[in-house]
């Protein structure tokens, strides 16, 4: 079993028996009902994440990726700075189970937060503020930045480096690709616009035809209605004529029977 396996096993055992630790259970209960503890824990997590990203930026060789990470760090710093007043309001609220000394310590923690947030490296020209004075020896930590004896940049600083050249080329390539994509989108929109215009013109041409069809349908409906009325009248006339003929035939039969009976009885 390796050392890592042993440490993992010990950690799992410690977590298993944490529920029997009275102090930890008390802290967990306090933080569960304490908005300050939750928010301050979120601050700590975001600050640690930002510091880790800042450390990754120093090791990042891709200039574009480093710029993107620095921008994300600056957004995180701005968001944290906006949330500091809320944390200050929560720090002065009394919480059950906390002493006066602990409340004072919370206020001190909140007062130290702006400096901690500002100290996070974000790739800006000024960088994090420092209380120490600038000396010529302070430039040794950044050998790629050189200062004159008067504190001004020398000519070597403004020369284009390989990283800046690569970043410029990558930026130009992405800009060209973006312009090509926008051109394709513009062409597609123009094609859709032309199709819509053609469809509109075709609909305009179809409107008179539809009106004419509606007129003809109305006329045919009226003619069919009149034809039905005339046909009904004709049928009624035929029925009346047929009934008259049947009545005459029946009358003749009745008269014949009467004449026969008269002759027989006579």
Curated annotation (Swiss-Prot):
CDD domains the record matches: SNARE_Qc
Name of this protein: Syntaxin-71
Family: Belongs to the syntaxin family.
Subunit structure: Part of the t-SNARE complex.
Membrane side Cytoplasmic: residue ranges: 1-243
Keyword field: Coiled coil, Membrane, Phosphoprotein, Protein transport, Transmembrane, Transmembrane helix, Transport
Taxonomic lineage from the root: Eukaryota, Viridiplantae, Streptophyta, Embryophyta, Tracheophyta
Biased composition (Low complexity): 130-141
Domain t-SNARE coiled-coil homology intervals: 172-234
